[in-house]
Design a protein with these regions (language model features):
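Catalytic-loop of the protein kinase fold
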Residues: 134-151
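Short beta-strand micro-motifs within the conserved protein kinase catalytic domain, predominantly
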Residues: 79-92
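Conserved catalytic-loop aspartate of Hanks-type protein kinases
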Residues: 203
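Activation segment signature within eukaryotic-like protein kinase domains
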Residues: 122-123
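Glycine-rich ATP phosphate-binding loop
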Residues: 31-52
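A conserved short helix/loop substructure at the end of the activation segment
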Residues: 241, 258-270
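Conserved short submotifs of the Hanks-type protein kinase catalytic core
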Residues: 89-103
Length: 383
């Protein structure tokens, strides 16, 4: 730990430098506390994360952070100060900036009441942070609405959006067995559920679910049990229902981002460029091409709000914190492969049966023709 802190910009902060430490929340990675840290001649609100398994797997965590340190200068990544140690448990804790408006999931009811320009600006900040991660050849690996944070200083008109928990999932996943799955099901790409590695494209899939939340005001699949059945449905192409009155250009981008084939999804840079075009000329529509003008007018004319027919109450087995799932990717793949095999045989059987029927009908027709009595009097055939 000492060598790591010496080599990086991170700090070792003695625990007695914190005051007013209080429990804040429990997340997928561990327990979260809020505290006041007197630093640079002023009080700073910070978060202390008591990370599950961090002390037992410190080397893995530090190695991961050597790579992720390059993202700390991004204005869209929550700032990571360093480490401390709980004197009672002797466990290491991560010290990070505190976002005073909570996470995106807790702000969805407010987001849905925003106009499209505000929504697009928020999405632009989120995808900018994701792009900052990807251009360093890194992957978030646990991107969901609980890791998108809102902060607002008293003098700001709107919230600043940050991405958090970058690099915190690797130490947890090092404890998993070969076929274990860890995460939040609705935000996990099909290929990840099936046991493949995380890639930038799997982060983009997660971003598509956040895009959908901006149209619905609720988390994806909140009315379903987050179990193997939902995972199977996601792998077979099921996605959240498109919300009425969503601008078509937005729907098309969202669908590209959640494509079942990872190679068909756009990169974070491509998504960033598209959203930037939607935002930049918002107040000067006359000076842009017809297609972009049409798209922007869609956003301007779209009603604010969401479909009142959506179920806003969550299912009792809907879980939106990262967790070890109670089924494995091996089980998931076995069921999917079995279904594919059944569908193949069913298709073969159906086409074969159709051919048999057609051949049978042709045969019967020939028999009937051959059995018809032929008149010996040709006059019988004349009209």
């Amino acid at each position: 730990m000492d060598n790591f802190i010496f080599e990086t910009k991170l700090k070792w902060i003695p625990y007695d430098k914190f005051r007013s430490v209080e429990y804040l929340d429990k997340g997928g990675f561990g327990t979260i506390y809020k505290a006041i840290w007197f630093h640079n001649n002023r009080d700073n609100e910070v978060v202390l994360k008591l990370h599950n398994n961090l002390s037992e797997n410190l080397d893995e965590f530090l190695n991961e952070w050597k790579y992720h340190e390059s993202c700390l200068s991004s204005f869209d990544i929550i700032y990571f100060y360093g480490f401390t140690k709980d004197p009672d448990t002797l466990k290491y804790m991560v010290v990070m900036d505190h976002a005073n408006k909570g996470n995106l999931r807790g702000n969805l009811a407010r987001v849905i009441k925003s106009d499209w320009k505000q929504k697009l600006c928020m999405l632009f900040e989120i995808i900018s942070g994701l792009y900052d991660i990807h251009k360093q050849e890194l992957v978030h690996c646990d991107f969901h609405d609980g890791n998108v944070l809102n902060h607002n200083n008293d003098n700001e008109n709107r919230d600043k959006i940050y991405i958090s928990d970058l690099g915190l999932c690797k130490p947890v996943k090092s404890f998993l067995k070969k076929y274990d799955i860890y995460g939040v099901i609705p935000f996990m790409a099909p290929e990840v559920l099936r046991g493949n590695s995380y890639t930038p494209a799997s982060d983009i899939y997660s971003f598509s679910m956040i895009m959908w939340e901006f149209t619905s005001g609720i988390p994806p699949f909140n009315n379903r049990a987050h179990d193997i059945q939902l995972s199977l449905s996601i792998c077979e192409g099921e996605r959240p229902e498109i919300i009425e009155n969503t601008p078509q250009c937005y729907v098309e981008l969202m669908k590209k981002c959640w494509d079942v084939t990872s190679l068909k999804r756009p990169s974070s840079k491509e998504v960033l460029d598209i959203i930037e075009k939607w935002i930049s000329p918002y107040n000067n529509v006359k000076d842009i091409n017809e297609e972009l003008k049409y798209n922007i007018m869609e956003f301007i004319n779209a009603p604010i709000g969401h479909n009142n027919n959506l179920v806003t109450g969550s299912h009792s087995q809907a879980y939106y914190t990262s967790r070890l799932l109670d089924f494995t990717s091996k089980q998931l793949n076995e069921i999917l492969e079995s279904r594919d095999l059944q569908a193949h045989y069913s298709s073969q059987f159906t086409s074969g049966k159709v051919n048999e029927i057609l051949e049978s009908e042709d045969l019967q027709a020939n028999v009937k023709v051959n059995e018809m009595p032929v008149s010996e009097d040709l006059d019988d055939c004349l009209i």
